[in-house]
C-alpha cells in the first residue's frame, strides 16, 4: 500500500480500526512528519518575514555631508545648573505629594528635612513581603 492510499484510509476514523499495525504505525509517522514539517516551514517563513520587517524598519545611519569649510568646534558646554535648584524642586514635589495625601494645602505644611530612605523597595513590595510572612505560618 502506498502512502497516498494509506493517508486516504487514515482520514476515515472507521477505516483506521481495520489497518494492520505496520500500516497504522506508518500512517502515524507520516502524519507526525507532515505536521511537524509544516510547522517548521511556517516558523521559518515567519522568521524571515520578521527579519525582513526589522531590516525595513531599522533606522538607517544618517550620512553627514562634509563641507569644504570645517565649522568651528564649539567650546565646552556650560556647566549644568547647581544641584540646589533640583533639591528645591524635589522638596516642592514631596510637599505636594504629602499635601495631596493628607488632603490639605502645601502651604499648610512645613518640611524641615528630606532624607533618602535606605530601603529602596517600593511600598507595594514591602506590603507583599509582610503579607507573605504573615500567611507563612
UniProtKB/Swiss-Prot annotation:
GO terms for biological process: sodium ion export across plasma membrane. Pfam families: OAD_gamma. It comes from Propionigenium modestum. Its EC number is 7.2.4.3. Signal peptide: none annotated. Subunit of the sodium ion pump methylmalonyl-CoA decarboxylase, which converts the chemical energy of a decarboxylation reaction into an electrochemical gradient of Na(+) ions across the cytoplasmic membrane, thereby creating a sodium ion motive force that is used for ATP synthesis. The delta subunit is required for catalytic activity as well as for the proper assembly of the individual subunits to an enzyme complex. It catalyses: (S)-methylmalonyl-CoA + Na(+)(in) + H(+)(out) = propanoyl-CoA + Na(+)(out) + CO2. The methylmalonyl-CoA decarboxylase is composed of four subunits: the carboxyltransferase alpha subunit (MmdA), the tunnel beta subunit (MmdB), the biotin-containing gamma subunit (MmdC) and the delta subunit (MmdD). It is a single-pass membrane protein. It is an enzyme of class 7 (translocase). The keyword Transmembrane applies. GO terms for molecular function: decarboxylation-driven active transmembrane transporter activity; sodium ion transmembrane transporter activity. GO terms for cellular component: plasma membrane. The chain crosses the membrane at residues 30-50. Keywords: Cell membrane, Ion transport, Membrane, Sodium, Sodium transport, Translocase, Transmembrane, Transmembrane helix, Transport. The gene is mmdD. It is found in: Cell membrane. Belongs to the OadG family. The keyword Ion transport applies. It comes from the Bacteria. This is Methylmalonyl-CoA decarboxylase subunit delta.
Amino acid at each position: 500500500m502506498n502512502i497516498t492510499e494509506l493517508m486516504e484510509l487514515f482520514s476515515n476514523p472507521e477505516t483506521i480500526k481495520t489497518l494492520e499495525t505496520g500500516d497504522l504505525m506508518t500512517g502515524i509517522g507520516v502524519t507526525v512528519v507532515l505536521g511537524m514539517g509544516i510547522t517548521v516551514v511556517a516558523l521559518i517563513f515567519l522568521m524571515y518575514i520578521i527579519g525582513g520587517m526589522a531590516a525595513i524598519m531599522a533606522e538607517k545611519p544618517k550620512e553627514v555631508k562634509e563641507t569644504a569649510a570645517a565649522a568651528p568646534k564649539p567650546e565646552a558646554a556650560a556647566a549644568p545648573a547647581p544641584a540646589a535648584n533640583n533639591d528645591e524642586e524635589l522638596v516642592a514635589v514631596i510637599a505636594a505629594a504629602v499635601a495631596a495625601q493628607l488632603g490639605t494645602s502645601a502651604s499648610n505644611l512645613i518640611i524641615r528635612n528630606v532624607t533618602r530612605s535606605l530601603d529602596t523597595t517600593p511600598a507595594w513590595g514591602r506590603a507583599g513581603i509582610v503579607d507573605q510572612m504573615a500567611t507563612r505560618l
